[in-house]
Regions:
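N-terminal localization/anchoring segments of enzymes in phospholipid and broader phosphate metabolism
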Residues: 1-313, 318, 322, 362, ...
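Hydrophobic alpha-helical segments and helix-packing faces
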Residues: 320-323, 337-340, 367, 371
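Helical hairpin unit composed of two closely spaced alpha helices linked by a short loop
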Residues: 333-354, 359-360, 364
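Structural motif
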Residues: 142, 331-332
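C-terminal structural cap/anchor segments
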Residues: 356-410
Length: 472
């Protein structure tokens, strides 16, 4: 009997030590690299570490990191003078200054912006940018599929490498697995450097299993940029007749100018992280030059674990409060956090016309179920919700005529708080109007969504999926 009591006390002591270790690990990681978690997520981790330490500690080490970088906060900037009526440059100054305060590169000039009308136009632009490279060609994507479109792009990359151009392909580890394990042998034999960003199994050992590089860009000679929401798979462009010919609507664009050099620097940072090289190993950053007063300006907005702030989220929140007339948004998945949902709702309540366009049915059924609760809240605030009959994969937001954000980030928790994402903030009013026109074209094919009250089972399932939304 005495031995049983001693053994029980030993087990309780050992359990208490394990719990203490788990909580110490949580506090130590949070102190070393502030994670800026939502309070509910922080509470959930603490409760799990206290009640289920043997399960929670390994999970936290594998999936718990959200931020990987800590740096000193930039100096605060002086107040902005009130903008005069019709002063377009001053109207968007808030967004540029916010970006700089978060450590982003300053807005850079660009020219020859092309918004691709459809998948065929986007495919031609991809091949044109690849063909234009004479020195360097950097490609970052989440998916490079083993289909007709993926094979065509891979062949173009091999051809460029054989011409002596330095070609680098950075593909996400999860994306490479989802797309059927790309055959990298022919690419590497042609001279293409191929690196997997955070391979799934190795990432578990590094505590990065929950982080994905969702960025999509092609940079030629650090001067031409192709960017947007399209993965390199047939359905994002013209479809593949052998797979049913399904075509998704998506948004991409290309341009020339100094913004391409900023994109090359961003690719270099991602490449160095994936290859574990020191930053700046191959690329000397282009100097910031004096920008002509009449230049069109845009700013790269990378978001993810390497950024101290949640940059896209911060711009969206500020945009909701700065908007005076309209907010146009298109996204395939809508699972915002409570703060962004409140900002959009408040904008609608004070008379800003808020239009949100989504596909009636996306390629993620669970996300479709989880979105209904925030959609009901937004509709109750006076926003207009639209469902397209086709799969809409575009990601863009327009604030008045001041700002257009376009790129890879969805309006969901994973894109806003976990993934490596890349958006471009356009400040040229004429180009902001062009993005708005693109979104309006998609809206013209949509049907107004009028939400209805859910039953008990649906309400419970929506709540459960929202709780699990980081994994969707």
């Amino acid at each position: 009997m005495t031995l049983d009591i001693v053994f029980e006390r030993y087990l309780l002591t050992l359990h208490a030590i394990v719990v203490a270790i788990g909580l110490i690990v949580y506090v130590a990681v949070a102190r070393a690299l502030p994670q800026r978690r939502d309070p509910s997520a922080a509470i959930a981790w603490v409760v799990a570490l206290a009640l289920l330490p043997y399960v929670a500690i390994p999970l936290y080490l594998m999936f718990g990191s959200r931020k990987l970088l800590m740096r000193d906060a930039p100096a605060l900037l002086p107040p902005i003078a009130p903008a005069a009526a019709g002063d377009d440059e001053a109207a968007s100054l808030w967004a540029r200054r916010l970006g700089r305060s978060m450590g982003l590169a300053p807005a850079a000039p660009y020219e020859a912006l092309r918004l691709h009308a459809d998948g065929a136009d986007a495919r031609r632009a991809v091949l044109e940018v690849i063909a234009a490279a004479t020195r360097t060609l950097d490609v970052c994507t989440f998916i490079l599929a083993r289909d007709r479109l993926g094979d065509e792009i891979a062949a173009a990359l091999r051809a460029k490498a054989e011409q002596g151009v330095r070609v680098r392909l950075l593909i996400d580890g999860i994306g490479a697995w989802l797309s059927g394990r790309l055959d990298v042998g022919p690419l590497r034999r042609s001279g293409v450097e191929v690196v997997t960003f955070v391979p799934p199994f190795r990432s578990i050992l590094r505590g990065r299993a929950n982080l994905r590089n969702h960025r999509k860009m092609i940079v030629a000679d650090a001067a031409r940029l192709w960017c947007g929401g399209r993965n390199f798979a047939a359905e994002y462009f013209e479809g593949d007749p052998e797979r049913g010919g399904v075509v998704w609507h998506d948004l991409s664009f290309d341009l020339h100018g100094e913004l391409g050099a900023r994109a090359a620097e961003q690719f270099e940072e991602d490449w160095n992280y994936a290859t574990r090289r020191s930053s700046g190993a191959h690329l000397v950053p282009a100097p910031y030059r004096i920008v002509p007063p009449d230049a069109s300006l845009a700013q790269l907005v990378p978001s993810g674990p390497e950024q101290v702030d949640d940059t896209v989220q911060a711009l969206l929140l500020s945009g909701c409060f700065m908007a005076q007339r309209r907010i146009l948004a298109v996204t395939p998945y809508f699972i915002p956090d409570a703060t962004l949902l409140m900002a959009l709702s408040l904008a609608a309540r004070r008379g800003v016309q808020v239009d949100l366009i989504l596909p009636r049915r996306s390629n993620h059924r669970l996300a479709d179920v989880a979105r209904h609760r925030p959609l009901r809240d937004l509709a109750a605030a006076g926003a207009r919700l639209w469902f397209t009959p086709f799969m809409l994969h575009a990601k863009a937001i327009v604030i008045d005529d001041q700002l257009a954000l376009a790129g890879s980030a969805n309006l969901d928790l994973r894109s806003l708080f976990l993934n490596y994402e890349l958006m471009v903030a356009f400040y040229e009013p004429a180009d902001v109007v062009r993005f708005a026109a693109w979104i309006e074209r998609e809206r013209s094919a949509a049907v107004r969504y009028e939400p209805s009250e859910p039953g008990l089972v649906r309400d419970l399932s929506e709540g459960l999926l929202l709780w699990l939304a980081f994994q969707l």
